[in-house]
Swiss-Prot record:
Disulfide bonds join C141-C224. Glycans are attached at N4, N38, N42, N211. The keyword ATP-binding does not apply. It holds the Pfam family 7tm_1. This is Neurotensin receptor type 1. It comes from Mus musculus (Mouse). Residues 398-424 are annotated as: Disordered.
């Protein structure tokens, strides 16, 4: 990707490099829009002629490659999340699920689906192919960034809430029966969406439509860009990074590590005792003592699989979201004087890579999180078989294996179906 000289930074460059004139509005204003969005990559450049200096000259091969990747992610993500939503909408399917994990999966599927439907088409149009003018009006500009940020917050918080649900179900199963009632889970998820909307409200006042043509009248100069000062936008970026990445990542990492350690201990105890009996202890006085769970050899393998899934959840979240937020924070912590021609070009290619990873998260979540719940996975595959006759025929050819429920001795009544759900 090569940028027109009128938008390059006049910072000190490497020896032998030709310096570029400092634009009228400065590089920082241009980077604001890039750092905030999946949208208009050139939205706040200073221009003399709207149809020349606003252009970011991405080579056609990069455009085609990014478009192909986006389309593949769009198809996989929309199909996976739509089937998940359809599965959860079936009353018969819900009756076969014993825990509240399906509420969290449904909320996550909805936020991922909205990200793919709302953000990806706009980005392909207004950043990859047509950089200017902004075609959706001032209300569309503000609404786009508001909805996109709200769905981003919702996805991150839904991933964290799912980790909380799994932690309670596995490490505190008796307490979970009380805390994770259906009504409380619905209220909790509703609170997540309300908080996500409130956190995204600043975008309604941060972004707006401006005409950056030389005379302020040329229709080709309309761009969706930050309309507030640089310091305010930096605060918005930093708050977004903390609430949509650092905070959820902390919860996910800690809780999934605790769960993985618990499952690992159960596997080791089962292996040592030979007959597959493990003891899960709790420190709560209400739950007191311990209970023994007889684990068959096949279930030991399932526990190991559960540990791998938990680690994959953490790794996927970090890999897909960390580069995206690092790219946005580049604007906050790199001064105008530090931007060179090479760094500026790197930023734009890095932009495409990080946003692709951002969408990978929404596309793989239906696959990754169906591994979290064995019961939900069975219902999901059953729904897919109903929607796809070819898939139904392949499933009929596969041998079916019956799995005996885990035996359990305790002073408390606890359903074996819930135990299977808890242990994946």
């Amino acid at each position: 990707m090569h940028l027109n000289s009128s938008v390059q930074q006049g910072a000190p460059s490497e020896p032998g490099a030709q310096p570029f004139p400092h634009p009228q509005f400065g590089l920082e204003t241009m980077l604001l829009a890039l750092s905030l969005s999946n949208g208009s990559g050139n939205s706040s450049e200073s221009i003399l002629e709207p149809n020349s200096n606003l252009d970011v000259n991405t080579d056609i091969y990069s455009k085609v490659l990014v478009t192909a990747v986006y389309l593949a992610l769009f198809v996989v993500g929309t199909v996976g999340n739509s089937v998940t939503a359809f599965t959860l909408a079936r009353k018969k399917s819900l009756q076969s699920l014993q825990s509240t994990v399906h509420y969290h999966l449904g909320s996550l599927a909805l936020s991922d689906l909205l990200i793919l439907l709302l953000a990806m088409p706009v980005e392909l149009y207004n950043f990859i192919w047509v950089h200017h003018p902004w075609a959706f009006g001032d209300a569309g500009c503000r609404g786009y960034y508001f909805l996109r940020d709200a769905c981003t917050y919702a996805t991150a918080l839904n991933v964290a809430s799912l980790s909380v649900e799994r932690y309670l179900a596995i490490c505190h199963p008796f307490k979970a029966k009380t805390l994770m009632s259906r009504s409380r889970t619905k209220k909790f998820i509703s609170a997540i969406w309300l908080a996500s909307a409130l956190l995204a409200v600043p975008m309604l006042f941060t972004m707006g439509l401006q005409n950056r043509s030389a005379d302020g009248q040329h229709p080709g100069g309309l761009v969706c860009t930050p309309t507030v000062d640089t310091a305010t936008v930096k605060v918005v970026i930093q708050v977004n990074t903390f609430m949509s990445f650092l905070f959820p990542m902390l919860i996910i990492s800690i809780l999934n590590t605790v769960i993985a350690n618990k499952l690992t201990v159960m596997v080791h105890q089962a292996a040592e005792q030979g007959r597959g009996v493990c003891t899960v202890g709790t420190h709560n006085s209400l739950e007191h003592s311990t209970f023994n769970m007889s684990i068959e050899p096949g279930r030991v393998q399932a526990l190991r699989h559960g540990v791998l899934v938990l680690r994959a959840v953490v790794i996927a979240f970090v890999v897909c979201w960390l580069p995206y937020h690092v790219r946005r924070l580049m604007f906050c912590y790199i001064s105008d004087e530090q931007w060179t021609t090479f760094l500026f070009d790197f930023y734009h290619y890095f932009y495409m890579l990080t946003n692709a990873l951002f969408y990978v998260s929404s596309a793989i979540n239906p696959i990754l999180y169906n591994l979290v719940s064995a019961n939900f996975r069975q219902v999901f595959l059953s729904t897919l078989a109903c929607l796809c006759p070819g898939w139904r025929r392949r499933r009929k050819k596969r041998p079916t294996f019956s799995r005996k429920p885990n035996s359990m001795s305790s002073n408390h009544a606890f359903s074996t179906s819930a135990t299977r759900e808890t242990l994946y």
